[in-house]
């Protein structure tokens, strides 16, 4: 099979939804890449999930830059908050990737599936925290950043599904919460990518063209296609019913999680 075509298709699919809904592609990329890698020769069954996590995180490194730039141009990034939360984010991604590297694929996959289902339910029910407080002090922001970074690294996401609700809860305007979350996604991706590269460095049995747990052939096709289609998704967001799209996206996530569960049971 021409796997590069499958990688391009995945990049287009995730980029389209990322542009329409402002959601990073990690939740779609990880389960799909896991299935793709498992179907190819040369990929050890015990490492396909780690390779999917690392490759997805590396892809987010590039896509988050484009998102950050766009939100900065619209003056939607609170750079003071980014500066306060980044040290905790970096510490958290280090913890998360080290933990992920030491956990076998099965419990890691179960954790990922639970997280995906929680996000899907949140999207279907459109649950949003009520603004009820101000941002915590430096120590509190560091602690929150550490938690966001660790969880984001464990499931290879840019952190938007965690950062935006937190900032909204702290009385940050939605536009600024989304823009700031996009900026926070960059240090998450840096720390997460380096962590997965380090954890998989010289790991025996990984396929050729792997840099740690990052599989370069998939990355090289995923990134351009997802970045190419994302602007179209953003334009479609103003023409299509966003609430319906979110429910469709959530249904796809649940189906992918179910497919991963079925794969673990056979």
Please provide the spans of the model-predicted regions:
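Juxtamembrane transmembrane-helix boundary motif
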Residues: 1-21, 28-50, 64-150, 154, ...
């Amino acid at each position: 099979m021409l796997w590069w075509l499958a990688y391009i298709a995945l990049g287009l699919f995730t980029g389209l939804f990322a542009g329409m809904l402002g959601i990073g592609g990690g939740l779609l990329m990880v389960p799909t890449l896991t299935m793709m890698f498992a179907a190819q020769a040369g990929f050890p069954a015990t490492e396909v999930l780690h390779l999917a996590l690392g490759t997805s995180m590396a892809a987010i490194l590039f896509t988050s830059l484009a998102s950050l730039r766009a939100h900065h141009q619209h003056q939607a990034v609170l750079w003071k908050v980014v500066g306060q939360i980044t040290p905790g984010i970096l510490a958290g991604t280090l913890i998360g990737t080290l933990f992920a590297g030491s956990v076998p694929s099965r419990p890691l996959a179960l954790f990922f599936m639970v997280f995906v289902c929680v996000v899907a339910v949140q999207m279907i029910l459109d649950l949003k925290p009520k603004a009820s407080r101000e941002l915590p002090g430096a120590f509190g922001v560091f602690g929150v950043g550490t938690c966001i970074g660790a969880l984001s690294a464990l499931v290879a996401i840019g952190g938007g599904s965690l950062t935006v609700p937190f900032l909204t809860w702290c009385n940050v305007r939605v536009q600024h919460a989304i823009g700031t979350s996009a900026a926070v996604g960059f240090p998450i991706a840096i720390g997460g990518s380096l962590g997965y590269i380090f954890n998989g460095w010289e790991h025996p049995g990984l396929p050729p063209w792997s840099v740690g747990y990052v599989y370069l052939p998939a990355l090289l096709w995923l990134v351009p296609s997802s970045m190419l289609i994302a602007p179209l998704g953003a334009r479609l967001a103003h023409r299509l019913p966003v609430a319906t799209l979110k429910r469709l996206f959530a249904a796809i996530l649940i189906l992918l999680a179910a497919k991963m569960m079925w794969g673990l049971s056979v």
